[in-house]
């Protein structure tokens, strides 16, 4: 083996430590002696294959072993290995070596599992106070979420011929199908009412000044309605169910007035379908959206911010409690809040175009009240 051999050198060795058998550069303790890789391998093979009885020296066992001559006489090399203290009992046969390797792997796997378990233990779960908050929010959502878990049985599909015939040209290359638009306006009032009812079931919301309540509701209404639709995405039919009753395709929602906003809501639905959110997680997402202290015109900014922080902390602890099998679940879920805020902003812009393109009499009063500035 060339003396310039490079590789891992243990920290316990001096920089220029030499092999006690041949004088080559040592790589560590092997079979109780400091040796090079070459002498380690030679000694191991000799013992494992019981080769030493076949070794014979041409010079009466008097060879000088160094890194040049070590391969010329196996008997003298082996004798020197024994003389310097290399231990034959430490050389494992194939079965023992496999058993040792298996044990090392098992210990490595056990350490890995212990580390995972330790990291899970270190993630706090909800306190008693947080559980009470979570219960209030969950009950508020369940009480105001149309059709609850039975939405698939209760939904009705919007006929395929509706939303396929664009009549009015809208800006940005979008189309508004007035028949589809009028269908959507029939369910928009109860959908908005349910969002308002959700908010009013939260004591911390009801304690805010009336003006702030209105600003918060106007700000979050489209975001919460979009979330409620997105979590009712059905991959089989590729539809969203609006207000727990009307199943629509991407094209129908787009042509019915939402334009590009439709794509954003559907994409969110596709993404959330792998998250398997329960009612509590949807409820807490809604509470976080509702209590957004950055809505323009708010008076009680600090108070609202503190409320949202309380929801976020309880939410994070609840996620720890749920133990989802998705890596980095919590930050990924928080990014959905950003997506929903973006949907709300895009809809505000889209609403202005709809006002221009669609007859005023088609807009329900509550729809105008919430989305007009």
UniProtKB/Swiss-Prot annotation:
The NR LBD domain, residue ranges: 129-373
Region (Modulating): 1-18
Gene3D superfamilies on file: Erythroid Transcription Factor GATA-1, subunit A, Retinoid X Receptor
Pfam families documented for this protein: Hormone_recep (PF00104), zf-C4 (PF00105)
Additional detail: A number of phenolic and phenol compounds can weakly compete with and disrupt triiodothyronine (T3)-binding including 3,3'5-trichlorobisphenol A, triiodophenol, 3,3'-dibromobisphenol A and 3,3'5-tribromobisphenol A. The synthetic estrogen diethylstilbestrol (DES) is not an effective competitor for T3-binding.
Record comment regarding domains: Composed of three domains: a modulating N-terminal domain, a DNA-binding domain and a C-terminal ligand-binding domain.
Name of this protein: Thyroid hormone receptor beta-A
Gene source species: Xenopus laevis (African clawed frog)
């Amino acid at each position: 083996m060339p003396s310039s051999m490079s590789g891992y050198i243990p920290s316990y060795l001096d920089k220029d430590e030499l092999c006690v058998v041949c004088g080559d550069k040592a790589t560590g303790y092997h079979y109780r002696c400091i040796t090079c890789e070459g002498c380690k391998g030679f000694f191991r093979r000799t013992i494992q294959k019981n080769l030493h009885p076949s070794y014979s020296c041409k010079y009466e066992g008097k060879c000088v072993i160094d890194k040049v001559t070590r391969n010329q006489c196996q008997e003298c090399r082996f004798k020197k290995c024994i003389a310097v203290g290399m231990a034959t009992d430490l050389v494992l046969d194939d079965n023992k070596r496999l058993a040792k390797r298996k044990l090392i792997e098992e210990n490595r796997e056990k350490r890995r599992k212990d580390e995972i378990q330790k990291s899970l233990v270190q993630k706090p779960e909800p306190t008693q106070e947080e559980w009470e908050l979570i219960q209030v929010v969950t009950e508020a959502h369940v009480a105001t979420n149309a059709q609850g878990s039975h939405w698939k049985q209760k939904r009705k599909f919007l006929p395929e011929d509706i939303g396929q015939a664009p009549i009015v040209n809208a800006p940005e290359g979008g189309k508004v199908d007035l028949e589809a638009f009028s269908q959507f306006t029939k369910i928009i009032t109860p959908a908005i009412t349910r969002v308002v009812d959700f908010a009013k079931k939260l004591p911390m919301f009801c304690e805010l000044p009336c003006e702030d309540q209105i600003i918060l509701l106007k700000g979050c209404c489209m975001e919460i309605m979009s979330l409620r639709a997105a979590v009712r995405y059905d991959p089989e039919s590729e539809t969203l169910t609006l207000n727990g009753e009307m199943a629509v395709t991407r094209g129908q929602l787009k042509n019915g007035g939402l334009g590009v906003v439709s794509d954003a809501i559907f994409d969110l639905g596709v993404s959330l379908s792998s998250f398997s959110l329960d009612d509590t997680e949807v409820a807490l997402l809604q509470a976080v959206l509702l209590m957004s202290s950055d809505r323009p015109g708010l008076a009680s900014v600090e108070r609202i911010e503190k409320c949202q922080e309380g929801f976020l902390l309880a939410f994070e602890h609840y996620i720890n409690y749920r133990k989802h099998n998705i890596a980095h679940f919590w930050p990924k879920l928080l990014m959905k809040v950003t997506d929903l805020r973006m949907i709300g902003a895009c809809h505000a812009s889209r609403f202005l175009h709809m006002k221009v393109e669609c007859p005023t009499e088609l807009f329900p009063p509550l729809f105008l009240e919430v989305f007009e500035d």
